[in-house]
Amino acid sequence: MSDPMIRVRDLSKRYARGGETLTVLDRLNLEMEEGRFYALMGPSGSGKTTLLRILAGLIPPTSGAFTFGRGEEPSIGMVFQQATLMPWRTVTENIRLPLEVNKVDETTALKKTSEMIELVGLTGFEDSLPRDLSGGMAQRVAIARALIHDPDLLLLDEPFASLDAMTRERMWTELSNLWQARQKTVIMVTHSINESLFLADRVLVLTQRPGKIKMDMEVDLPRPRKDEIRYTSQFGKLAKKLRGAIE
């Protein structure tokens, strides 16, 4: 077993609201290993996105702490529900934005951007603007942008929630293949049981607010995963177990 990449200890998040205190996360404890894919599930309001934002450094915890195994903060890529692309920038320009921010030289930036465009299957759309892309293509651009600086940790906040069912399922396969190629540590918030089981190595289920870990389930399914695995008896058993924990 790998050493934990992330350790969360007694982490709580509270907000003052209308003269009262709203506790979103309550003394959360968990460990996550490097190079694994985690799905984070639970009822709406259970603190899934809040935890993601804390790990990304976007908001602080109220109490408790989280640490990274290497002793230093990893580089992080994040993808939200909406692609949040800059509408005036082409596919190429949107993807290479993190390299521009980090002042990567032009030759290296062009090479990395070209490789990433090929990896996410957008060859031929390099000069397209976001308005000319389908929802699935826009999310591929967002994922490519998050991956281009080779982050240690990829955080995904329901990245496929706004897509139609068929596109969403195709994106599962594409993301699974991307993970297989890169083996990054991924934490994904989702409400979909099938999505969790198809993509993740482990599924963490949070309780109703205030969020605590209710279930930590290993997804014992072989990789690489193909669409057909969703119709196997083992997949069905895991789905039933997971549904019971969420309900």
Positions of the model-derived regions?
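Hydrophobic anchor residue at the start of the ABC signature
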Residues: 79, 143
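The feature captures the beta-strand-to-loop junction immediately N-terminal to the Walker
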Residues: 41-43
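Short coil-to-helix segment of the ABC ATPase nucleotide-binding domain corresponding to the Q-loop/switch region
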Residues: 89-96
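Conserved signature/switch motifs of ABC ATPase nucleotide-binding domains
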Residues: 128-131, 149
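Conserved ABC transporter NBD signature motif
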Residues: 64-74
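Helix-to-loop junction immediately C-terminal to a conserved catalytic motif
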Residues: 56
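Conserved ABC ATPase "signature" region
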Residues: 100, 107-125, 176-177
